Amino acid sequence: KSSAASDVYKRQTVDDTTLIEQPFICDYGYNICFGRNFYANHNLVILDTTTVKFGDNVFIGPNCGFYTAGHPVDVKQRNSGLEYAKPITVGNNVWFGGNVIVLPGVTIGDNTIIGAGSVVTKDIPSNVIAVGNPCKVIKSI
C-alpha cells in the first residue's frame, strides 16, 4: 500500500505543479486530493463519490478514468437506485498509460507503471509494471 495516502489527504491543494489538460470531468471535486507534480492528459474522468487520492509525481495519459462508484449485481437493488462507493488511492511516482480505467476500492503502490488500456480491478503493489484487462503485474522494477 502507498505511503502517500495520509500525506496527500492532509494537503488537499492544487498548486503550480498541478496540470490537468482539458477536458476534465469529475462528480464533486472536493473528494479529490492531488500530490505535488501531478499531470493529467486530455479527457481525465474522476467519479469522486468518495475520496480519490493521488501521491506526488503522478502522470496520467489521455482518456483515463478513476471510478469510485459502483452498483449492485442484483437487478432489484440496482433498479432501486442503490449505489456504493469505495475510495481509490494512488501512490507516489505512478505513471498511467492512455485509456486506463481504475475501479472502486483500488490502491496502487509507489513507483508503479500501469500500461495503456488496462482495467485495474484489484490493488497493485509498489515497484511493478502492470498491464491488461484485468490488470496484472508482469514485472518488478
What does each model-found stretch correspond to?
Residues 95, 113-115, 119, 127:
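A generic "structured core" feature
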